[in-house]
Amino acid sequence: MNGVWIEVRVITSCEAIEPISGIFYGLNSQGVAVEDPNDLLTRDQGPLTWDFADINVLEHKGEFAVVKAYFSGDDDLEKIVSITKEKVKEIQEMGIDIGKGIVECDKIKEEDWANNWKKYYKPSNITDRIVVKPMWEEYLPKNEELVIELDPGMAFGTGTHETTRMCVKALEKYVEHDSTVFDVGCGSGILAIAAAKLGAKLALGVDLDPVAVESAKENVGLNDLDNIEILEGNLLDVIDGKADIVVANIIAEIICILTDDVSKALNKGGLFITSGIIHERVDMVTSKLDECGFEVMEVNKDGEWNCIVAKLK
């Protein structure tokens, strides 16, 4: 590799940050960094309000976000850029605003990569009680705070996105000490880890992506939890038994595909917490939930995104 890394960037909208980050993790990037000026501007000032520390992004406030991914210098740059452009176009075809949608790339020295990508991640309060911190940062919990430790360069899900925060808030509200929780499309494992830290009897994370599965397992290890398991595969194919709560932070189209399986994986009266739903897709998801025997209890909003909590009748 000769000490060289590839940086691929997409200049996009705040709405498209999550799906574009997902593209890069699907391409097995070694890390993803997000520059979102609006995220900085909408948070209360304080020592834990900064999800990333590059103040220069404020120069672009409200204009655009930038999602950066890092790949080995030995990877096929032309192929990575081509696939990224194709996937960004697919996101646009789903009705998600991609903003400028410009894909750029550069080669950078290894020492620049090693120092630069980590500066974007600092300890962050995702609820009043739960703090997410990267593994290399020190943090002393206050009062009854729960700290989730992550290596955010390994798989999607760092806790900084609106959809993740809303899912964690819902888990905080509904997880009980005898709860069994399934996290579908677990990515980094952050939601399963949150459920386990909140006292769930058992949390199971499942993902189709073997890279995500390995990442989630490593993050579970960082948090020293024994009430959590990470599995590779489809929900009903790999999980036995039923859950009290199923959580899925994905996109509306996939939620609709999963809903019938989720109804079979839940105990009667169980909850389906789901996010990754833009405003234009809320009616589609709630209709599918109703069709599959769910009663919608909550529709929570944060920015461009929605989180739905539904109860199996």
Swiss-Prot record:
GO MF, any single term: protein-lysine N-methyltransferase activity
One GO term (biological process): methylation
Binding residues annotated for S-adenosyl-L-methionine, in chain numbering: T164, G185, D207, N249
Enzyme class: transferase
GO cellular component, one term: cytoplasm
Localization per Swiss-Prot or TrEMBL: Cytoplasm
InterPro entries associated with the record: Ribosomal_L11_MeTrfase_PrmA (IPR050078), Ribosomal_PrmA_MeTrfase (IPR004498), SAM-dependent_MTases_sf (IPR029063)
Pfam families: PrmA
Keyword Transferase: yes
Reaction catalyzed: L-lysyl-[protein] + 3 S-adenosyl-L-methionine = N(6),N(6),N(6)-trimethyl-L-lysyl-[protein] + 3 S-adenosyl-L-homocysteine + 3 H(+)
Key words of the record: Cytoplasm, Methyltransferase, S-adenosyl-L-methionine, Transferase
Keyword ATP-binding: no
EC numbers, comma separated: 2.1.1.-
Disulfide bond entries: none
CDD domains attached to this UniProt entry: AdoMet_MTases
The protein's role, per its UniProt record: Methylates ribosomal protein L11.
Recorded family membership: Belongs to the methyltransferase superfamily. PrmA family.
Name of the featured protein: Ribosomal protein L11 methyltransferase
Source organism of this protein record: Clostridium botulinum (strain Alaska E43 / Type E3)
Lineage start: Bacteria, Bacillati, Bacillota, Clostridia, Eubacteriales
